[in-house]
Amino acid sequence: MSIDGNFYPLGSCTMKYNPKRNERLAGLPGVAGLHPYQDESTLQGMLAILFELQGMLAEIAGLDAVSLQPAAGAQGELTALLCAAAYFRDKGEKRTKVLIPDSAHGTNPASANLAGFQAVTIRSNGQGLVDLDDFRAHLDDEAAVFMITNPNTIGLFDPQIGQIAELLHERGALLYLDGANMNAILGQVRPGDMGVDLMHYNPHKTFSGPHGGGGPGAGPIAVRAHLEPYLPAPMVRQNADGTYGLDHDRPRSIGRVRAFFGNVGVLFRAYCYIRSQGPDGLKAVSDHAVLNANYLMALVRHAYPVPYGDRCMHEFVASARSLARDRGVRAMDIGKRLIDYNYHAPTVYFPLVVSEAMMFEPTETESRDTLEAFAEALLAIAAEDPETVKSAPLTTPVSRPDEVLAAKQPVLKWTPDEAVQPAAQERQPVASGQASFI
């Protein structure tokens, strides 16, 4: 199943179509043939593109400076938090905590811990948004950063973000935006205008870079001016004579986080995407992403209840809890059965605040026909014999391997005697609860 010809509804992954124009441009000899050890004088074209990309990402974010070095969203989180730590260290403030909503991506607490902070969970309220009372209770002089994803992983925009930013800034803390869901707000609102101090982008999501093989990705970070001195060195700069170079003279920088200039291939594709869309095109991206998600949600929510919100942003989270209770069919089973209908499964069992969660993100590049056909498959599965669904997939050579064992003891080579396996062995179902993700 290729992203070029199939629908990937993976929530929080933004599996949009990857324009082939960008691939052709990235393959041009003047791009693909570059080497980072070349003299700067021979890299002027690419350095100009990277410099311009820094400016475009800063403008989209409504912030002042951008580093392109981080190689993935999670590394962007870590880099931004290291910059925040350096900022507070220079101020002589001992801040030890990073506040994180319970609906956050798992990389958020991991990044906080790696940066030397204690991750403190802030619970959600009954509407799936940040519980302001719990937030206030944990916001003290030891709090350094609040990491928010907005829209959040439930697919809801939190209108409290301005108030959250004000409360943070009153205590001298910073507001961080996990930019994983920027596809929902491109051209609609700038994070900086919401009070965000620092954030990361996922160009391989928002700006259409290919996800193939789990990477490569990129995780540029954007910051306000008072955090700019701490960005990784070197930065791409424009010299007084109009040429471009690398600025290594950054005494307060946290240092390198990635060799050379970052993952330039992904960054170049993001540049091509932004230039081809333009401001109006980027706004249309988010318009259609939100429209598609709401249309799909309306088609299926009577069979798969959506616990939070009447409308969503770019994605929504449905629950298979009632199917699990009444028919023994869990989110995992539904995801497996979709394979028989030639669809990739959605993200399941995330976010953790929804029982039997199924997260759907159709993106802006899917047609109405595709959404309706996918909804028909979901509705058919909801009405099927439970035993059929629980034994799926039925059309694949291997049905349900032990996914936990595969992760813990991966077999990374093939031998001829493994070529033929008895069907009975191939179709051993995984025990209930043994694996959480497809």
Where are these regions (language model features)?
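A short, small-residue-rich loop immediately preceding and capping a beta-strand
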Residues: 64-70, 97-100
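General small-molecule cofactor/ligand-binding pocket signal
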Residues: 67, 120-122, 346
